């Protein structure tokens, strides 16, 4: 019981430190990127470089994910509270969202097509090289 409590506190402390560091970066680098996103990037870098082990944050992260719906209730209430303002500004909000979605889909589509062709080309090139090596061996 005490060990599980220690693991939970440790994971929440690590997640809180990442959030704090992200907010610190957002304060000193005014790029418009929120501190929570910077914190997620720091957490991602820590996990990929294995500075932070997954089992260190697993318990706290799973607890937060379990109650994620409850954490989004204030956002939903804010949307309902200011729905008249959102309806007034629908053109300003809707057009950029549609354009950015279309641009994202196009970029992902072209990138996926390009990467698929590169993989296919690499496979074909390896087959040609192997065939030429076999022809050289047979000629000798």
Swiss-Prot record:
Record-linked NCBIfam families: PRK01821.1 (NF002494)
A Pfam family assignment: LrgA
Primary location group: membrane
UniProt key word Metal-binding: no
Topology term for the membrane: Multi-pass membrane protein
Keywords from the named record: Cell inner membrane, Cell membrane, Membrane, Transmembrane, Transmembrane helix
Chaperone as UniProt keyword: no
Family: Belongs to the UPF0299 family.
TM region(s), chain numbering: 1-21, 33-52, 60-80, 92-112
Source domain of life: Bacteria
Entry GO terms, CC: plasma membrane
Cell location: Cell inner membrane
Name the record gives this protein: UPF0299 membrane protein HI_1297
């Amino acid at each position: 019981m005490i060990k599980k409590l220690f693991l939970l506190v440790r994971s929440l402390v690590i997640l809180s430190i990442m959030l704090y560091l992200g907010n610190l970066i957002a304060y000193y680098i005014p790029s418009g990127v929120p501190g929570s996103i910077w914190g997620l990037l720091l957490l991602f870098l820590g996990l990929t470089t294995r500075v932070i082990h997954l089992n260190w944050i697993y318990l706290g992260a799973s607890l937060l994910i379990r109650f994620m719906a409850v954490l989004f209730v204030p956002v939903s209430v804010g949307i309902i509270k200011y729905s008249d303002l959102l309806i007034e500004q629908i053109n300003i909000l809707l057009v950029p969202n549609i354009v950015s979605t279309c641009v994202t889909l196009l970029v992902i589509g072209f990138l996926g097509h390009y990467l698929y062709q590169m993989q296919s080309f690499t496979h074909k090139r390896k087959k040609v090289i192997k065939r030429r090596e076999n022809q050289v061996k047979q000629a000798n």
